[in-house]
Regions:
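Short, glycine-anchored, charge-dense loop/turn motifs used at functional sites
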Residues: 163-167, 268, 449-451, 662
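Charged, low-complexity intrinsically disordered terminal segments
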Residues: 296-736
Length: 736
């Protein structure tokens, strides 16, 4: 390695050596390694710390460039190293990443100024990650400020240290511990723990934390920052700390990092900490337990976690850890993307019901489908079948400030039908961020506790009308045009979990007790050979849907199909970039939020639909430019479609991901921030190759008939200005 290619070092050390050389040996302690600190030592350390802090400041990093974040992982795990190059992007063609003094990899520089590489985590230890910018001849032309830490866990129990302990001025309103954290940290290290720091906040406070760690001479370790700002999540004053904390612990364990303990400003033996099997302690508790000799229990817990990981497949381990779901064998699954067939199958299932029909919808709106649904349910109720019907209060306009949905009123008039509006808003005092954003987005149907439908369809014509069933001419309103949607029908032991999910919500929302003679949880025998799991996300309580999608992306080796038409949350965007970095094919089938004619022009529609279309496509553009194959759905020709071209480009409402012809997810969860954080969702993950291959064959047929979006095409370019303006101005609260 030449001098100009010297690997990134601690800036304080580099400044120290330069200063010593200039001083001509005046202060030999500088290079002799003397522990006493000279004035020059202190100046070099202070200036170096300042430069490192600049490299950790998000705003300065975007301007001047720098490595994005510290990483904590385990040996052999895939690790993404990323950097923003800032103004340095203009100086070269390649970014060269270093891990300590070794070149870890290179990435070409494009117009985004963002670079990333994937490596396999090295042996346990603490490594410095830096980046240099090189020209087309491989010569270094710029050295980015600062470095980040790659911490590879050793297998010892890991304690996450809350930043509030070292940043007392940032923990406003919280009691600060009387015991200095340094004493507790030393005790934990002496007992065999490995340390890492974490912060959960609206803003990215990484630079302040780093500065304080240096000032207090605290042990170096990765600083893990979970900020709403970086997730483009508008929190609207809602406290996300518990949700992000459990997410952080689960994600680290999924990577083989045995987190057993959290060191924070107050003891919290809470339901959440018990559920995550983590011990929460204050510094004083640590010292007390160290004296009592009871800190060593964590080592056995860490060892057991690593043994469990070694016994599991990568997919099962990640889903087990990040979603707290369990795989259930012995099921049969059937997917349906044809709206007309879905309607006929659903009504046939109602006719087959002998004891109970349980239904949950997000939206129930006036439509021909809904009228038929109401009649069918009343018929079955009068035939002796008990019907339990749940709707989201806000989006079905039921029990919100006294409002009543007349469709639901007809159901409530029947003796054998019970109706609940989930999360009603009974007075203006209840109107607030949580009541408006924390909604129940699930769509479930369970027949006799033996058959279930988990899907994305609401009660409306656009969800249950086939593209060949609706007359469409050039001036047909967007609202009349069907959407692409999907459900998965389940029979077998997994149905019990769907039923239990429904019943938990039913009872939590005040539903009537189940009669003793009505067995809503019958014993279920295997009906097939397919394994699957139910992923349930509770809004503001966990991030199970987000974790499900990230886990599926992270285990993919060959290809991924995504069917969705919502802006993708940054966590999943980064996961998609990791897919592309390891040459995994990514096909994204989307639609048009305002339906288009075959030539790409819009059908008549409300303005907000067209603005939403521009915003979503604007959010997809970086993925398209990075290498994602983006397709806009086009329906087959139909005698019922007489609009120009004889075909339409409809909205895509399905929420479907399929990976490697091995595993598929279908349900209610979009890939956006609303589904990831705010609303409650339910998806089924089918871990069966035959099912996945069948679904992917359907998707590929849809893609073959669709329009491949090309950033250089006139179709894409003609709306570029609109996308740019709307993406910039669209209020984040609407899609986060």
């Amino acid at each position: 390695m030449t001098d100009e290619e010297e690997a990134p070092q601690d800036l304080g050390e580099r400044i120290r050596r330069i200063a010593a050389t200039i001083a001509g040996g005046v202060d030999k302690r500088l290079l002799a390694g003397d522990d006493s600190e000279s004035v020059l030592d202190a100046a070099a350390r202070s200036f170096g710390a300042t430069m490192e802090r600049w490299g950790r400041n998000p705003s300065l990093r975007r301007l001047l460039g720098g490595v994005q974040r510290d990483v904590l992982t385990s040996q052999g795990e895939r690790v993404e190293l990323s950097a923003s190059l800032g103004v340095s992007a203009k100086l070269g063609t390649t970014a060269r990443f270093y891990v300590d003094d070794a070149v870890a990899g290179e990435a070409p520089i494009d117009s985004s100024g963002e670079v990333r590489i994937l490596i396999n985590a090295p042996a346990p230890g603490l490594y410095r990650v830096g980046v240099k910018v090189c020209n087309d001849k491989g010569k270094v032309v710029s050295d980015l400020i600062g470095y980040r830490l790659l911490q590879v866990a050793s297998g010892r129990p890991v304690v996450l240290v809350h930043a509030a302990l070292v940043l007392p001025h940032l923990s406003a309103g919280r009691p600060h511990p009387r015991t200095s954290p340094i004493e507790a940290l030393r005790a934990l290290v002496d007992e065999g723990f490995e340390l890492a720091y974490f912060d959960i906040h609206e803003k990215n406070r990484d630079a302040s934390i780093y500065e304080e760690l240096l000032r207090q001479r605290l042990p170096p370790a990765a600083i893990l920052v979970y900020s709403a700002e970086e997730e483009e999540l508008v929190s609207l004053g809602v406290d996300f700390v518990n949700m992000f904390a459990s997410t952080a612990i689960r994600r680290l364990r999924a990577k083989g990092v045995p987190v057993t303990t959290v060191l924070t400003e107050r003891d919290e033996d809470s339901e959440e900490s018990r559920a995550e099997q983590v011990t929460v302690m204050t510094p004083s508790t640590v010292l007390r337990r160290a004296l009592a000799g009871t800190l060593g229990d964590a080592a056995a817990q860490a060892a057991e976690l690593l043994r469990d990981k070694a016994r599991s497949s990568p997919l099962d381990w990640r889903l087990d850890q990040t979603t707290k779901s369990r795989v259930v064998p012995g099921n049969s699954f059937a997917a349906e993307l044809d709206n007309g067939k879905a309607r006929r199958r659903l009504f046939a299932a109602f006719d087959e019901a002998a004891a109970t029909i349980h239904i949950q919808f997000y939206i129930v709106r006036p439509s021909d489908f809904t009228e038929h649904l109401i009649v069918k349910l009343i018929q079955r109720a009068r035939a002796g079948v008990t019907v339990r019907f749940m709707v989201d209060a806000l989006y079905s306009d039921q029990d919100v400030l006294g409002r009543v949905n007349p469709l639901i009123l007809s159901l409530k008039a029947e003796d054998n039908i019970e109706v609940i509006a989930v999360n009603p808003i009974e007075s203006r005092k209840q109107v607030g961020v949580s009541s408006l954003k924390k909604r129940d987005h699930r769509k479930l149907v369970i027949i006799d506790g033996r058959r279930a439908f988990v899907n994305g369809r609401n009660a409306g014509d656009e969800y249950f009308s086939g593209f060949d069933e609706v007359p469409v001419h050039d001036n047909t309103r967007h609202e009349r045009i069907p959407w692409l949607d999907a459900h998965v029908e389940v029979s077998g032991p997994l149905v019990r979990e769907v039923q239990e999910t429904f019943m938990r919500t039913w009872h939590r929302q005040g539903g009537a007790e189940i009669p003793a003679d009505q067995d809503v949880l019958p014993k279920l025998e295997p009906t097939g050979s397919a394994a699957g799991r139910l992923i349930v996300h509770r809004g503001l309580a966990d991030t199970n849907g987000l974790a499900m999608y990230e886990s599926l992306f992270d285990v993919a080796e060959d290809h991924v199909y995504i069917v969705n038409d919502f802006p993708i949350v940054p966590t999943l965007e980064r996961a998609i970039y990791r897919l592309l970095a390891r040459d995994v094919s990514v096909k994204l089938l989307t639609g048009s939020a305002t339906a288009r004619r075959d030539d790409g022009t819009f059908f008549p529609a409300p303005l907000h639909r067209t603005l939403f279309e521009y915003m979503v496509k604007g959010k997809f553009e970086p993925l398209l430019l990075a290498g994602v194959e983006l397709y806009e759905l086009v329906t087959p020709p139909s005698p019922m479609i007489v609009a120009r071209g004889g075909r339409i480009r409809p909205y895509v409402h399905a929420k479907l991901v399929s990976v490697d012809g091995l595993v598929t997810s279908i349900g209610s969860a979009n890939l956006d921030a609303t589904a990831s954080f705010w609303e409650s969702e339910a998806n089924v993950v089918v871990q069966d190759a035959e099912f996945a291959r069948g679904v992917e064959a359907i998707l590929q047929k849809l893609i073959d008939g669709s329009v491949a979006l090309d950033p250089e095409s006139q179709y894409w370019k003609r709306e570029r200005a609109q996308r740019a303006v709307v993406s910039t101005l669209w209020p984040g609260t609407f899609y986060s």
